Amino acid sequence: MKTKNLNGIYNVVGLNIKKYREANNISQRELSNKLSLYGIDLYHSDISRIESLQLFVRDYELKVICKILNIKLEQLYENTDKFFNF
């Protein structure tokens, strides 16, 4: 499967992942470790690339990230309209 990007961006939720991760005082390495408990193998460098919009993130990864950060999926899409030309 070829991964598409939107004007060089591979996801629109990375900035919010970073915001909520930092609000929960969780490091990228800690998030990576917590994800591995759910069977998701993302290194801390992958988390960094997701947060900088440089790595595609799968829907099931988002669900687990939300569970770890104790947020709803909708919260990851806050203020993401700026990435689209509506």
Q: How would you describe each model-predicted region?
A:
Residues 13, 24, 40, 55-58:
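Flexible coil/turn residues that form the inter-helical turn or adjacent wing/linker of helix-turn-helix
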Residues 2-8, 30, 67, 74-86:
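Short, charged recognition helix plus adjacent turn
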Residues 54, 58-75:
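DNA major-groove recognition helix of helix-turn-helix/homeodomain DNA-binding modules
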Residues 18, 22, 36-37, 52, ...:
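Residue-level detection of the helix-turn-helix DNA-binding "recognition helix"
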Residues 1-24:
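A short, Lys/Arg-rich alpha-helix, primarily the initiator
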Residues 25-49:
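Short alpha-helical DNA-recognition segment
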Residues 17, 28, 44, 59-62:
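Helix-turn-helix DNA-binding elements, focusing on the entry/boundary residues of the two helices
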